[in-house]
Amino acid sequence: MDERLLGPPPPGGGRGGLGLVSGEPGGPGEPPGGGDPGGGSGGVPGGRGKQDIGDILQQIMTITDQSLDEAQAKKHALNCHRMKPALFSVLCEIKEKTGLSIRSSQEEEPVDPQLMRLDNMLLAEGVAGPEKGGGSAAAAAAAAASGGGVSPDNSIEHSDYRSKLAQIRHIYHSELEKYEQACNEFTTHVMNLLREQSRTRPVAPKEMERMVSIIHRKFSAIQMQLKQSTCEAVMILRSRFLDARRKRRNFSKQATEVLNEYFYSHLSNPYPSEEAKEELAKKCGITVSQVSNWFGNKRIRYKKNIGKFQEEANIYAVKTAVSVTQGGHSRTSSPTPPSSAGSGGSFNLSGSGDMFLGMPGLNGDSYSASQVESLRHSMGPGGYGDNLGGGQMYSPREMRANGSWQEAVTPSSVTSPTEGPGSVHSDTSN
């Protein structure tokens, strides 16, 4: 079939913008007898056809410059042309010939495994799908893995985790909704174009479905990026709130004060008993294992850098001495028997509560009750703080060379006289 459909022929069979051109003699738009009028082309067949092709190409190049009204008018003229069915049948024949190659390229592509992993993770974390409390389940699992009971601090952290996870979920769903809306709008636009073109050229329903799948595959890159960023945000949130290996949290200031006070008041033997650990754990609001770990770390740090902790030891020693003297003035109970811990011996001042001040004698014996009373009266109402001066309460010489702990030596500010063990004087010469 040599006929080509360009539009309704102009009146009088002349050459128009849209006409039905035929290469056969006597065809529309060509004078009878064949060839060019008057034999201008020397009887060469096809000369007029080359000119027609040039006109067609020129019209195609000017399509973009046409207004909407002009385009609608030419589309209507094409649909109403008497040769439209013939043109459509030719296009269907061509479509059947090329249909095999199109069908061979329509193989279903497998789902991206990375996208499947992202979807599974978002479902497990409670971000994707219906809200089922995935954040609460993750928080409970992390609490169980980190050691059992949920402390108030942990409950606050889990509440923060759930609120931030809900915020991530809200952002994810809002962005996913925008993505789906844009994808649906573009798909609808393309489907409308294909339906409009199906009036001119044959477009099968399967081809429309294939085009929709291509559009979705193009948009899937945006979807994958959104899910990837959401998964990264969830992982960062988990590592910050629920990871058991995260950076340890420091104790409260009050708990640290209590532990340091006990450590420096028992510097000669900083190994609290199980009863003392339980008491300290109750005071600090922590577990017994945390108390044990704190004392173990504190002993190691103190041995490694005694000079650095000497000033801190003096501060807590003064606090302990002041608390002891204030307790002695407020209560008049008799002093307790000397403690037998350590080789040097020590005595306990009554009224000191849980804090004890170990003060061995120079000869290795413990002070008697009369010596304690004499020492207390020699201190005067000013307490230890007035009589200690600038001397150090605890000396680095308290530890043996092999790293083991022993009883503290007599403080430099309190010395035993040489004339006899019956009296104790305060030495403020330093």
UniProtKB/Swiss-Prot annotation:
Amino acid composition bias (Polar residues), ranges on this chain: 403-418
GO MF, one example: DNA-binding transcription factor binding
Positions carrying Phosphoserine: 136, 151, 159, 330, 395
Domain PBC span(s) in chain numbering: 48-243
Domain of life: Eukaryota
Gly residues composition bias: residue spans: 13-48, 380-392
Region of interest called PBC-A, as start-end residue ranges on this chain: 55-134
Stretches for region PBC-B: 137-243
UniProt keyword NADP present: no
Tissues expressed in: Ubiquitously expressed.
Pfam families recorded: Homeobox_KN, PBC
Keyword field contains Transcription: yes
PROSITE patterns per record: HOMEOBOX_1 (PS00027), HOMEOBOX_2 (PS50071), PBC (PS51978)
One example of a Gene Ontology biological process annotation: animal organ morphogenesis
Function: Transcriptional activator that binds the sequence 5'-ATCAATCAA-3'. Activates transcription of PF4 in complex with MEIS1.
Assembly description: Forms heterodimers with MEIS1 and heterotrimers with MEIS1 and HOXA9. Interacts with PBXIP1.
Protein name per its UniProtKB record: Pre-B-cell leukemia transcription factor 2
Source organism (scientific name): Homo sapiens
Lineage: Eukaryota, Metazoa, Chordata, Craniata, Vertebrata
Gene: PBX2
